[in-house]
Regions:
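A structural signal for small-residue-enriched, beta-sheet-centric alpha/beta enzyme cores
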Residues: 161-174, 178-184, 189-301
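Helix-rich "cap/lid" substructures immediately adjacent to catalytic or cofactor-binding pockets
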Residues: 89-104, 127-156
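Amphipathic, non-membrane alpha-helical segments in soluble helical-bundle scaffolds
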Residues: 35, 39, 82, 86-89, ...
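Generic N-terminal targeting/processing segments that precede catalytic cores or assembly contacts
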Residues: 1-107, 131, 240, 247-301
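Glycine/serine-rich anion-binding loops at beta->alpha junctions
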Residues: 101-126, 167-174
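Alpha-helical support elements that line or immediately flank enzyme active sites
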Residues: 122-133, 181-186
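Hydrophobic alpha-helical segments and helix-packing faces
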Residues: 117, 135, 139-142, 146, ...
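Glycine/charged-rich beta-loop-alpha catalytic/anionic-binding loops adjacent to active sites
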Residues: 100-110, 153-163, 210-215
Length: 301
C-alpha cells in the first residue's frame, strides 16, 4: 500500500507497471473485491461521466437560474473557428462546465473527488480522448490514475472545501486530471507526479466562497480553469519540466494553507465573492427571508 506520491511512483517504477495498475492492486487488497468487480465499478463511473457531459452539452440550467448554458456557448465558439486557445483546451473547458452545470441542475454526476469539482477529470478525459483515441480500457485506467493521486491528497491533506478551501476541491481535481493525462499520453510515473505538483502549486490559496452557499457561482467556472490548468501542466511535464518542490511537499503545503484559512473562506458563504454586494443580492433573491428558497417558479418552504 502506498501512503504518498513518492511511494506510489516507486511502486510503479519497481513493478514496471502504470500507476493505474498500482491503484487497482491496492483496491483489490483493501476492498476484497475481484479485479473484474473493481474495474466494473469504475466503468460504471465512466458511464455516469459520459452521460453528464452529453446532457450538459445539450444545455441545462439550474433551478436558481445562477448557472447554465455556458457549455453550449463555449462549444459554439469552438465551432466558429475564432477561438484563440487550442481546441483540446477549450473542449476540456466546455465539458468541465457541462458536468458542473448538470450538477447544479440536480443531475447525476460522479464526484471526482467532490461534486463541486466533478467537472475537471471528465472534462479533460473526454477532451484528450478526441486527440489520443484511447480504448475504453485506457479511459478506465485514466480514472484509476486520477484516483491514486486523489487518494494521496485525501489521506495527507483534504479534498473538502469546508476544510481546505477550493484549492482542496478544484485544486485536487486539477492535479488528479493532470497526472492521469500524462499517463494516458505515455508519460512516466514521475512525470505524472510532476504534473500533479505543477498543477497544485498554481491552485494554492484558492478559497471556497460559493454565492448563497450553492455550488454554482463561482464553482462552475472554477472547474473550467481547473481543466485548463491540468492540460497545461500535463503538457509541461511531458515536455520535461519539473517542479522544484516535490509533489508530496506541495500537497502538505496545501494542507497547511487550508488550516490557516479563516472559516469565512471555507464554504461558509461568509466571505470572498459570496460577500460582495452582488453576491448578497443574489442570495437575497434566492432565499428571501431565509426560510423560503425561490427556485424560478418553484418554491420550497
Amino acid at each position: 500500500m502506498f501512503r504518498n506520491v513518492a511511494e506510489l511512483v516507486q511502486l510503479a517504477e519497481t513493478n514496471q507497471v502504470k500507476i493505474a495498475e498500482i491503484m487497482i492492486r491496492q483496491e483489490i487488497e483493501v476492498s476484497g473485491l475481484t479485479r473484474e468487480e473493481i474495474i466494473a465499478k469504475m466503468d460504471k463511473n465512466l458511464t455516469v461521466m459520459e452521460q453528464a457531459v452529453e446532457r450538459g452539452l445539450r444545455g441545462v440550467h439550474s433551478h436558481t437560474g445562477l448557472t447554465g448554458g455556458d457549455a453550449v456557448l463555449i462549444q459554439n465558439y469552438i465551432k466558429s473557428g475564432k477561438a484563440l486557445g487550442g481546441e483540446v483546451l477549450l473542449d476540456a473547458v466546455s465539458k468541465a462546465v457541462a458536468t458542473n452545470e448538470v450538477n447544479a441542475a440536480m443531475g447525476v454526476i460522479c464526484a471526482t473527488p467532490t461534486a463541486g469539482s466533478a467537472g475537471v477529470v471528465p472534462g479533460t478525459l473526454f477532451a484528450v480522448k478526441e486527440k489520443l483515441q484511447p480504448t475504453r480500457e485506457e479511459m478506465i485506467e485514466f480514472l484509476f490514475t486520477a484516483a491514486a493521486f486523489g487518494f494521496v491528497v485525501a489521506n495527507n491533506a483534504s479534498i473538502s472545501g469546508a476544510a481546505g478551501g477550493c484549492q482542496a476541491e478544484v485544486g485536487s481535481a486539477s492535479g488528479m486530471a493532470a497526472a492521469a493525462i500524462v499517463e494516458l499520453a505515455g508519460g512516466t510515473a514521475q512525470q505524472a507526479a510532476e504534473a500533479m505538483a505543477i498543477t497544485l502549486k498554481n491552485m494554492l490559496g484558492l478559497v471556497c466562497d460559493p454565492v448563497a452557499g450553492l455550488v454554482e457561482v463561482p464553482c462552475v467556472k472554477r472547474n473550467a480553469m481547473g481543466a485548463s490548468n491540468a492540460i497545461t501542466a500535463a503538457d509541461m511535464a511531458l515536455a520535461g519540466v519539473t517542479s522544484r518542490i516535490p509533489c508530496d511537499e506541495v500537497i502538505h503545503a496545501m494542507f497547511l494553507i487550508g488550516q490557516s484559512m479563516p472559516s469565512s473562506l471555507r464554504e461558509t458563504a461568509e466571505g470572498g465573492l459570496a460577500a460582495t454586494p452582488t453576491g448578497r443580492r443574489l442570495e437575497q433573491e434566492i432565499f428571501g427571508n431565509g426560510n423560503t428558497v425561490k427556485l424560478k417558479n418553484l418554491i420550497i418552504t
